[in-house]
Regions:
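C-terminal alpha-helical "lid/dimerization" subdomain adjacent to the S-adenosyl-L-methionine
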Residues: 235, 252-296, 300-306
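Class I SAM-dependent methyltransferase SAM/SAH-binding core
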Residues: 153, 161-209
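Conserved alpha-helix/loop element of class I SAM-dependent methyltransferases that forms part
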Residues: 114, 125-148
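Conserved class I S-adenosyl-L-methionine
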Residues: 148-158
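N-terminal accessory segments
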Residues: 1-89
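A short glycine-rich, Lys/Arg-flanked "PGG" loop and its adjoining helix->strand segment in the class I
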Residues: 235-247
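A short acidic, Gly/Pro-enriched loop at the edge of an enzyme's catalytic core
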Residues: 208-220
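A short SAM/SAH-binding and catalytic strip from SAM-dependent methyltransferases
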Residues: 218-232
Length: 318
């Protein structure tokens, strides 16, 4: 497989000053909306101040100490520098690489411990605010059922940051998080154990082949996964989400903005692809997600963009 490793010193597309202003305005609008929806009690205001600052303060020097390793991989254009002890047969081929030059890919405790801090640095502290954009459409579609002990599956849950937002908005829900990485699930367990209430069920597995029976979930969420999947894998994940949802169940999908919905930020998307190792990003930003949803059997309800995130809401007919 061609991993599409970026150049060691990637040339970038110039970002004009006016675009920087538009990015700043878009980020401010996201943060204002986040505060407004918390004030409307869609989720606790405490979630807006939920970042583990003391933990990150300890790990921040580790991010800097990791930079020489990242630069060495970039120089070698090595995007398959993974822990030797992993069994590669346990993972799909597209997963076995150093996405955005992450040390160990997604396959070590060290990677899992640094990941959330690295993402917040990249997105200027807005990652959780973007994750919370799935809450309003999810609650709207659930209606009165939001107070019931419904089952909600989060595909590619990673370190559990989305589950943490969902726990705040749906305190009675039975939450399930699925991820390919045992290391990231261990980190998720640590984060989620800090909050009151029932601990979400954490399951190691592949979104293309969900280990659940047909029609057992009332809602499915999936955040920041699709841009790291080849097209056929995206379709399989949607097919599986449709399968495990009950008739009338809701899917809320959040991922990077795309060229069609945010053409103004095209240079930013191009630079993201060039600088970071994101081998499927170019294909993703041109992909027709509503068409894929319909192909799986979903009815697309709405799609909206917030800063760097696009959110699609869809329902399984029945």
């Amino acid at each position: 497989m061609d991993r599409g490793a970026p150049q060691a010193s990637a040339s970038t597309v110039p970002v004009p000053p006016e675009m920087m202003g538009e990015l700043r305005s878009s980020m401010d609008e996201l943060l204002e909306l986040d505060w407004k929806e918390a004030q409307q009690e869609l989720y606790p205001t405490s979630l807006l101040f939920d970042a583990p600052w003391l933990d990150w303060a300890v790990r921040y020097p580790l991010v800097w100490l990791d930079l020489p390793s990242i630069w060495q991989r970039r120089t070698r254009r090595d995007v398959t520098d993974l822990p030797l002890e992993i069994n590669t047969k346990d993972y799909p081929d597209y997963y076995l690489q150093n996405f955005h030059h992450q040390t160990d890919g997604y396959l070590s405790d060290r990677s899992a411990e640094l990941y959330d801090l690295q993402v917040e640095i990249l997105f200027n502290g807005t990652a959780d605010a973007m994750r919370r954009r799935l809450i309003r459409p999810l609650l709207d579609q659930l209606g009165a059922r939001r107070a019931d002990p419904i089952r909600v599956l989060d595909i590619a849950t990673g370190t559990g940051r989305t589950l943490r937002q969902l726990r705040g908005a749906l305190p009675k829900a039975q939450l399930v998080g699925l991820d390919l990485s045992a290391s990231y699930l261990r980190q998720a367990n640590r984060w989620l154990s800090e909050i009151p209430g029932e601990l979400p069920q954490l399951v190691q597995g592949n979104g293309e082949d969900l280990p659940f029976a047909n029609g057992v979930m009332q809602a499915v969420t999936c955040v920041f996964l699709f841009h790291e999947l080849p097209g056929d894998a995206r379709q399989k994940v949607l097919d599986e989400a449709w399968r495990v949802l009950e008739p009338g169940g809701v899917l809320v999908l959040a991922d990077s903005i795309q060229l069609d919905d945010s053409p103004t930020f095209g240079a930013v998307m191009e630079n993201f692809r060039r600088v970071f190792h994101e081998p499927y990003y170019r294909d993703y930003i041109a992909d027709n997600i509503p068409e894929r949803l319909q192909r799986s059997g979903f009815e697309v309800i709405e799609a909206n963009s917030y800063f760097m995130t696009r959110v699609w809401t869809a329902r399984k007919s029945g």
